[in-house]
């Protein structure tokens, strides 16, 4: 999923798939026991797909279409936490089911969506191999924190493949700007897909 962000409509199902990855949850301080609560909030706040109106517009949809996007839903959550069952603000109705200790979950979810937005914008731009190497390194650092030996194995493998690809590009003198599709295929080509599936729950590090 992460290496297809520029093409993504950001449906709820994709974000929930990411949240099924232990290494991603660890990076954003989200516990497995938090997932049912997050599922309930996402559904209750009316989130369906799309980061925001601007991201939807990039897919050729009307510019002002913000409703049922992630930003729309998160604003409902934050407003509901702030005012409870109070009146709406700026056309947004508060989602008032958030309170108590669970409210601390809002921050990590906002941080995840913010990180996905930044990554989406960066990955959409063609770049020379050196810049791609930095982007891929940042992607691993921003989204994943190994919480066990299995996670650590795959993240190390991905980092080694990144370095090998960069060395190959340098050895052949490749300095042209490359699109994401080319980089994605080159980086992941060396992964042992069988081990990847075995070592990460639910398909896990979803590149």
Model segments located where?
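Polyanion-engaging groove/track-forming segments
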Residues: 1-207
């Amino acid at each position: 999923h992460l290496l297809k962000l520029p093409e993504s409509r950001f449906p709820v199902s994709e974000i929930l798939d990411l949240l099924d990855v232990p290494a991603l949850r660890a990076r954003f301080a989200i516990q497995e026991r938090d997932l049912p609560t997050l599922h309930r909030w996402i559904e209750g706040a009316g989130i369906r797909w799309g980061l925001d109106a601007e991201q939807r517009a990039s897919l050729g949809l009307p510019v002002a279409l913000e409703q049922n996007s992630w930003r729309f839903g998160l604003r409902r959550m934050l407003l509901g936490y702030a005012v409870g069952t109070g009146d709406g603000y700026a056309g947004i109705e508060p989602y008032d089911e958030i309170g108590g200790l669970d409210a601390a979950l809002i921050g990590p979810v906002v941080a995840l969506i913010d990180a996905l937005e930044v990554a989406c914008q960066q990955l959409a731009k063609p770049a020379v191999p050196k810049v791609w190497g930095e982007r891929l390194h940042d992607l691993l650092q921003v989204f994943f924190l190994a919480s066990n030996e299995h996670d650590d194995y795959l993240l190390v493998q991905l980092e080694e493949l990144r370095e090998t690809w960069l060395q190959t590009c340098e050895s052949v003198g490749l300095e042209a700007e490359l699109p994401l599709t080319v980089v994605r295929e080159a980086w992941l080509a060396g992964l042992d897909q069988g081990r990847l599936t075995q070592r990460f729950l639910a398909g896990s590090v979803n590149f």
